[in-house]
Structures are given as structure tokens and as C-alpha cells.
Amino acid sequence: MSELLNELELERTEELRAALRALLRRPLLGQAEAPELFRLIRKHEDALRRRANELLGYQLAVRADHARLFRPAWRLDASRPAAVPHKTEPQDRWRPFTSRHYLFLYLVLSLLEERHSLVQLPLTELADLVCRLGVEIGATIDFDQRSERKLFVEVLKWLGHWRVVRVSEGESQDDYVDRGRDGDCLLTVDQGRLASLASAHRPLTEISCAADLIHEGEHAPTDEGRRARVRHTLARRLVEDPVVYVDDLSEEERAYFLAQRPTNLTRSIEEATGLRAEHRVEGSAFVDPDRKLTDTRFPDRGFERQLPLLLCPYLATELEAGRAELTLPQLRGAVRALLERHRAQWSADPDDPDTVDHVTGDALSLLTRMRLVETIPAGVRVLPAVHRYRDPSVRTTRKEET
């Protein structure tokens, strides 16, 4: 009997972990796109809700056909932008939204949120409504321009990725990009998913600046509430960020982190998520052995991921030598040397200054997102986690396009 109970408990633990991992990857998840995972979410709804709240301070809402993990915007963070869905590219390589994308997204969500009766409407009608609302807030929108139509449709595709907006069978939003009003199509709005996606601690129409989005969650103004806020902040950073450095923490956070890191904090995160802790004196990182619970796969295949990886030994060597701050000319020189060394495998021309500038910028952008370097006025400051990649192994079998 005890053996059977152990097996059942192990199965329950694995199912809970799979469900939480699914929600962390895709916080709006439903029956339509992931029936088996949604079944697990429904099965363990109460336990999942407690675990998400106790560990991370997140709230879980489970509806008839979808679940929503609410992750409060507790800081301004530009490292995880919305991005344009692409059918043939992995999500971490989708093109980030521009400010214009966000304008259209704000207008569309505001319109659909205010008009709960809108279930179906032509794309051109939605475009007209967006233009009128744009005028009201002082934004000039011209859908006679193909570039504007393209941005608008890319926002609709992002909403389609979350299954909030669906295009009728046999029609395409891309026709509107190419043909304007002659390329109309019928949109179906899932009002339930829309309400879950757009839910915030205040209505969108009341948000006037980025700071209005900040909402750390509900923590009582007591000693216990303060401790819960510190605990949730640290757990979120450890789960969401590539690495957490001790020097980046407040005094209160640092004291809790150093006291709890070897035991409770690490164990709770590992058991709940399946992530594995890597600790150094300077900080901690939680990595996924399956390489699925991540915003950005690194290392990974492809020139744009291999070159930053091969730059890490140079960065680690400079850091060890006490030269943590590197200028852009130094970095371009290191990139140029790598391009020359791998000329047979990569098509980027090391003799073209514009190419070197572009490749260097892309590499530093990725390394910054991974918290391996941080930007300073003169260039970058190398951070300790770069030592993790000081001896990379890269295999290239053919010449790769850049």
C-alpha cells in the first residue's frame, strides 16, 4: 500500500510541475491548443493556485476553456517585449514589437475591452475604429500606407497567437496588408480570452504611462507582508531572469537571499518547476535541463547564437585580468577576429566595418539579455556569469547565412 501511495504522490508531483511549467511558458493556455496540459491544470487547480501564489505571488484563474496565470508587472522590464509571431521561427527569435506596434495593441485592446458585444466584425471595421480612437488621443494613423497596415496586422497576429482573435476559415489578414480595403476578412473575437489577456489592476483607459502598469501584488503592510514581498520578488527573479546577482539586490533582499539560498528557496523552486540551481559567490541561476522553460535559448544553433557564445571566452579572460569594462572598439576587434577565424563557416565579411558593427550590436544585445554583460556609456561591463561559457563547443557543418 505504501508503495502505491508513493507512486501516486510522485505522479501528482510530476503533473503539478508539468502544469506550472506550461503556465510559466504560456500564461494564457487553453483546451484548444494544449488539451492534455489543460486537463492537468483543471485536475490540480487548487494545488496549482496555492503553489503559484505561495512561491511567486502569482494568481491563477481557471475558466471553462482556458487558464490564465496573472504575473503582476512588479518592475519595468524591456527584456521581454511582445513580438511578431512567425510560423517558421522559434518564439525567442520573433521580431520585437516597436512603439508603433504597442500603440496599435493599446488601441485594439481598449476598443475590444469597451465593446463587450463585439464577437465578429470585419477587419476594415476594426481598422476604422482604431483610426477614430487614434484621433481622440492625438495619434495620427494612415491605413492607406502599406507599412501601417502591416504593423496593424502583425498586432492582430499576436492576438491570434493567444487565440483572442481568429480569422475566418479560408481568409487571410495578409490580404489586407497587400490590398487594403479590398483585402477584407472576418475576425472572431473570443471575449473570454480577451478579458483574461487584458486583465490588469486598473482599466487600460486609465493607464497614461509605463509606471501605471507597475503592481507588485497584494502584500499586507505588516512584517509578514514585507517578508512575503521580499520572498516573492526573489523567487520571481530567480525563475524569470537568466541570473540574479547578489550586488543587484537591496539590503533586505540580499540578507534573505543569502540565508535562504542554500536550503528553502532553492528547494522550493526546484521542486515546483524542475529547474536546477547553479550557485556562485556572485549570484545564482536556475537552468532548465530540458531547455524548454526559457525565453531565450542560449547556447543554440545558428550564427546569431554561436558568435556571442564564442565571444564569451574573450570576455571571461578580460574579466579575470581585471578588465571588466570594455569599449566598443575593443569588442568590434574581438568580433572581427572571430569572423576572420570562422570565415569558411560564416558568410559575414570581417573586412566590412558595417557588417562588424551590426554583428557586434546583435551579439551584445543577446549577451545583455542573458545578463552576461551590462551596458555602460563607453561599451559594456562584463558580468561574472560569463565564466559559465568560457569553454564553449560549437560545431558548424556548413556556411551559415547572417
Q: What annotation goes with each model-predicted range?
A:
Residues 108-186:
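Internal, well-ordered domain-core segments that constitute the primary functional module
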Residues 317-322, 330-402:
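C-terminal functional regions that serve as terminal interaction/effector modules
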Residues 166, 170-215, 369-402:
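C-terminal engagement modules used by replication, chromatin/transcription, nuclear envelope/ESCRT
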Residues 1-90, 169-179, 193-292:
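Eukaryotic partner-binding/assembly regions in large regulatory complexes
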